[in-house]
Design a protein with these regions (language model features):
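A residue-level marker of the well-folded mature domains of exported/periplasmic proteins
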Residues: 1-177
Length: 177
């Protein structure tokens, strides 16, 4: 039930990604508890998470030197085997070509709306946009692969909306409207 998450630094989209990860983890395991370690502090984030009992460790960013994360070049979610080695399970895949294509098409068609200076534009496109997918390791069991395919398809079709739920903090306070 303990899942480790390595965040790069507590700014910008990192906390949002952590929260999204926690929501997804709890969809399949309501007892899931996410343990957080930052890679921006000295030491090995993966070892710290393992010492706290995490056997599943996730990281949304590319491997970073001296964090102990995914020396094989893998990133995403890994399983810590009995020998202490990271075994890849799944990885998010950002399909930037689809994002760029949609942006360029909207500019060329005249549908691009320019925002006021300093106003943020939302580039957090979900699976339904075709800009994000998931890659599963060959070691993932067939039943889990099947479940992942169902969830992927339902998110792409708008049938599953994991982020339209009431979000509560650790004290039970509602944090969204």
């Amino acid at each position: 039930d303990l899942i480790g998450y390595v965040g790069s630094y507590p700014i910008l989209g990192v906390p949002a990604s952590l929260c999204a990860f926690a929501i997804g983890a709890r969809m399949t395991n309501p007892r899931a508890r996410i343990l957080l370690e930052w890679s921006c502090v000295p030491g090995n984030a993966a070892e710290r998470l393992a010492s706290r009992g995490a056997r599943i460790i996730s990281n949304r960013d590319l491997p970073m030197k001296d964090t102990g994360l995914f020396e094989s070049g893998e990133y995403g979610t890994c399983f810590l085997d009995d020998d202490g080695r990271m075994q890849p399970l799944a990885s998010p895949v950002w399909l930037w070509d689809r994002v760029y294509e949609q942006v360029v098409r909207s500019v060329l068609s005249g549908s691009w709306t320019q925002k006021k200076e300093g106003e943020a534009i939302n580039y957090y496109w979900g699976m339904d946009s075709g800009a994000i997918d998931i890659r599963l390791s060959d070691s993932v069991p067939a039943g889990v692969r099947q479940l992942a395919a169902i969830l992927r398809q339902d998110m792409r079709e708008g049938q599953l909306k994991p982020f339209t739920t009431v979000l509560r903090d650790q004290d039970g306070n509602v944090r969204n409207d």
